Amino acid sequence: MSAELESIDHELEESIAALRRAGVRITPQRQAIIRYLIASHSHPTADEIYQALSPDFPNISVATIYNNLRVFKSIGIVKELTYGDASSRFDFNTHNHYHVICEKCGKIVDFHYPQLDEVEQLAQHITEFDVTHHRMEIYGICKECKDKEE
């Protein structure tokens, strides 16, 4: 088994354990949605998840996807990313990281810059706020969109 598959399986097991601790029933559909989110690095919308899973789960609906995403978000295993009027996107990676977003196609790419972790501590120290989180986005044009323009 490849290291990536082992990692996906491990993260799936951890997510299922978190759901069980929260008293959430584990269904094949829930497992499939989580597995898709873990394996996908594209920050999919609920519709994209539906399109990917509906061939294997013909009875699944977009409403089912949204309901499960809401449960996952409330437990803390998924983050909802909202950008303007566009559909929400969902990110399995809930650790502090940042996003670069293409202004043309909406593609979102993760990146981590450790020095930015200090921003919360500094903001808390200077303002005396109890800082709970922060969000940073960088916008630009992705390579694929730049190549199309040329």
Swiss-Prot record:
It is found in: Cytoplasm. Coiled coil: none annotated. SUPFAM superfamilies: Winged helix' DNA-binding domain. GO terms for molecular function: DNA-binding transcription factor activity; transcription cis-regulatory region binding; zinc ion binding. One of its GO terms (biological process) is negative regulation of DNA-templated transcription. It comes from the Bacteria. Pfam families: FUR. Gene3D superfamilies: 3.30.1490.190, Winged helix-like DNA-binding domain superfamily/Winged helix DNA-binding domain. One of its GO terms (cellular component) is cytoplasm. Zn(2+) binds at residues 102, 105, 142, 145. Keywords: Cytoplasm, DNA-binding, Manganese, Metal-binding, Repressor, Transcription, Transcription regulation, Zinc. The keyword Glycosyltransferase does not apply. Residues 1-84 are annotated as: DNA-binding. PANTHER family: PEROXIDE-RESPONSIVE REPRESSOR PERR, ZINC UPTAKE REGULATION PROTEIN. Manganese-dependent repressor that controls a regulon of oxidative stress resistance and iron-storage proteins. May act as a hydrogen peroxide and organic hydroperoxide sensor. Belongs to the Fur family. This is Peroxide-responsive repressor PerR. The lineage of its organism: Bacteria, Bacillati, Bacillota, Bacilli, Bacillales.
